[in-house]
Design a protein with these regions (language model features):
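N-terminal nicking endonuclease/strand-transfer module with a His-rich metal-binding environment
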Residues: 1-270
Length: 270
């Protein structure tokens, strides 16, 4: 079943990261970083289903080298990255259309360039884990060049409302596609807490996102702390659903035994 997942992170020079290196890895390409003289070759990387640059007249190399050249500070944020889960109910072509549509929407809203790469599930991981990485410039593209900074995304008090809009738009794009495909699933970008508030109900327990390495460990029976927390959340949510209504955290009591049972199951984490 499709799930909603959208996370945003920054590519910071002060952490030793490079936008060129990140782009090369995401797209599975070989790129030269003109600022450092390094070459990043990920052409042997597997699992890249599709990739494209939106809102920039040049190629991937020229985009991210221009982004790096535009920043002079040692601790500059040279790119933003949005990671999204893609509906497993759709095929590769339809998933690519969704990501491209979202990238164009971001470009129109903020005037930035977007470089996206769609990845297939890891061979040893959850086979529903289709996802995409969208690298976003921290500057607007003006006259085919790096222009003004996207200040609306730099200030925390303002960036939150924009990220909320991103989440809402991505959910809407997915839901339209799922409905056209005849799927009953509908994604909700809101947190469980916000979903429950209008009804005065107790929200479902949220689960933590697990990366590929943690997923592999859990499949081998070595549960990480986040996996244990997810098992607890699933046990709680199962109890809440079985009541037919969400009416109190008292249901949590007595569920510890269910956690052990959940840990013995083949965890299917994203």
């Amino acid at each position: 079943m499709a799930i909603f997942y959208l996370a945003v992170q920054s590519v910071r020079r002060g952490e030793g990261r490079s936008a060129v290196a990140a782009a090369a890895y995401r797209a599975g390409e070989k790129l030269d970083d003109e600022r450092t003289g390094e070459t990043f070759n990920y052409t042997r990387r597997r699992g890249v289903v599709a990739s494209e640059v939106i809102g920039w007249q040049g190629d991937r190399s020229s985009l991210w080298n221009a982004a790096e050249a535009a920043e002079n500070r040692k601790n500059s944020v040279v790119a933003r990255e949005i990671v999204i889960a893609l509906p497993c109910e759709l095929d590769d072509v339809r998933r690519a259309e969704l990501v491209k549509s979202f990238a164009h929407w971001l470009h129109s809203r903020h005037g930035v360039a977007i470089d996206y790469a769609i990845h297939s599930p890891d061979k040893d991981g959850d086979q529903r884990n289709h996802h995409a990485h969208l690298m976003v410039t921290t500057r607007k593209i003006e006259g085919g060049r790096m222009g003004a900074k996207t200040r609306e995304l730099d200030q925390k008090q303002h960036s939150r409302k924009h990220i909320e809009a991103w989440r809402s738009e991505w959910a809407a794009i997915c839901n339209r596609a799922l409905a056209l495909g005849g799927t009953d699933t509908a994604l909700d970008h809101r947190s469980y807490l916000r979903q429950a508030e209008p009804f005065g109900a107790v929200p479902l327990e949220p689960q933590k996102h697990l990366g590929p390495s943690e997923t592999r460990l859990n499949r081998k029976g070595r549960m990480t702390a986040k996996a244990k927390q997810n098992a607890w959340a699933r046990a709680v949510n199962k109890g809440l659903h079985q009541t037919g209504r969400l009416f109190g955290r008292g249901l949590v009591r007595g569920m510890n035994a269910m956690i052990d049972a959940a840990g013995k199951e083949n965890l299917r984490e994203r």
